């Protein structure tokens, strides 16, 4: 099982991607997904038996993914900077797994979902919004598509008019130079290249403690440099991430535009 639509969920909850509230939501949502996925696998094990190499596994030894942070910390000899614990009572599920075992060796992995998220009209996996404005092409030609959540919020504030449409087109969907847009909406609709990677990594670390496999975590930097990359990847290591995926950057032409 994976995840997609995180950015849209945050819009609906009114949280900026780069915010403590968003980090907490990642933690709580992933905990709930993990709990019920692992419970379903334990129920399947009671019905059909455990997977072939279950004996001696971490599941068999009573270790859930969140428990392995302490193992990682002990192996490294350095603190893993991620809060332990969660909102749910895992005691009944631990007892169920101890009694019934697990049908699946791995239950959760967050894939990129770039294609299927388009089909289902939601945001890809756990990524921030890439752009608030983009151009789609079909047999009839090209047409502009705006972030529908942004449009809804602008209408609710009485800011949706032809001047706003023209400004959004002129600034390619970027909000920071449009004076009429309030600061809270600018924060809420920051796009991937304007979000500090620390927020992406902290949210990923909160998800990772519940995930038994791994996740596709892309990072965005407009103009990478050695110092920034060093700090970014060291932070990823300190918060216990298993992996990161692509590092996205802007070409010189895109950046100056």
Tell where the protein language model's regions lie, with residue ranges.
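A generic alpha-helix surface/boundary motif
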Residues: 4-6, 39, 148-149
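Internal maturation/activation junctions in enzymes
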Residues: 1, 15-113, 216, 232
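Glycine-centered flexibility motif
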Residues: 2-5, 49, 125, 173
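Core structural elements
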Residues: 1-13
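Catalytic alpha/beta core of large soluble enzyme barrels
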Residues: 83-87, 96-254
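Residue-level detector of conserved catalytic or cofactor/ligand-binding positions
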Residues: 257
């Amino acid at each position: 099982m994976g995840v997609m639509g995180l950015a849209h969920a945050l819009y609906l909850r009114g949280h900026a991607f780069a915010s403590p509230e968003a980090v907490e939501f990642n933690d709580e949502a992933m905990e709930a997904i993990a709990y019920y996925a692992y419970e379903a696998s334990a129920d399947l094990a009671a019905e059909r038996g455990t997977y072939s190499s279950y004996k001696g596994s971490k599941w068999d030894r009573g270790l859930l993914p969140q428990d392995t942070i302490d193992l990682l910390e002990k192996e490294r000899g350095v603190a893993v900077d991620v809060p332990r614990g969660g909102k749910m009572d895992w005691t009944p599920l631990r007892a169920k797994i101890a009694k019934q075992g697990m049908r699946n060796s791995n239950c959760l992995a967050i894939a990129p979902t770039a294609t299927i998220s388009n089909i289902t009209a939601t945001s890809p996996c756990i990524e921030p919004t890439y752009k608030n404005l983009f151009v789609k092409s079909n047999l009839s030609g090209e047409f502009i598509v705006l972030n529908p959540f942004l449009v809804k919020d602008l209408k609710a504030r009485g800011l949706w008019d032809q001047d706003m449409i023209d400004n959004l087109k002129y600034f390619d969907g970027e909000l920071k130079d449009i004076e009429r847009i309030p600061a809270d909406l600018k924060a809420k609709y920051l796009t991937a290249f304007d979000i500090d990677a620390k927020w992406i990594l902290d949210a990923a670390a909160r998800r990772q403690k519940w995930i038994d496999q791994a996740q596709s975590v892309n990072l965005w930097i407009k103009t990478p440099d050695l110092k920034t990359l060093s700090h970014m990847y060291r932070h990823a290591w300190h918060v216990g991430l298993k992996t990161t995926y692509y590092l996205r950057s802007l070409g010189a032409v895109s950046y100056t535009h």
